[in-house]
Regions:
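Flavin-dependent oxidoreductase catalytic cores
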Residues: 1-115
Length: 115
């Protein structure tokens, strides 16, 4: 069972990192097998963050608190950035959405880029 969590709402009085981590610990206890960390209801971008993987501080905090795999989604458009996020331990898996919509060969090109 996978759960996608809008961990960062970017809204006044919205979810905090502590809220997200606490929720993920409870989800793991309830039997969730994988958590996908993404933005929240306030939009799909994060104000003040333009780096690829702009929810990586949330995924890192969640990863430190749970023993199940954590997937990071958010602005990841380049294979090298995805690989760097994985290698640095920010997440166990990377979610790519809009980049695939823009380029149907994204996955094939990404494999070539990191090999």
């Amino acid at each position: 069972l996978a759960l996608r969590l809008g961990a960062c709402e970017s809204l006044t009085n919205g979810n905090t990192m502590e809220d997200a981590v606490s929720a993920c610990v409870q989800f793991e206890k309830a039997g969730v097998d994988l958590i996908d960390i993404t933005g929240g209801l306030g939009g799909y971008v994060r104000p003040g963050h333009s780096e690829q993987g702009y929810f990586q501080d949330f995924s890192t905090a969640v990863k430190q608190a749970v023993s199940i795999p954590v997937l990071l989604t958010g602005g990841i458009t380049e294979a090298a950035a995805a690989d760097a996020l994985l290698q640095s331990g920010k997440a166990d898996l990377i979610g790519v959405g809009r980049a695939l919509l823009k380029d149907s060969d994204w996955a094939k090109n990404a494999l070539c880029a990191v090999q």
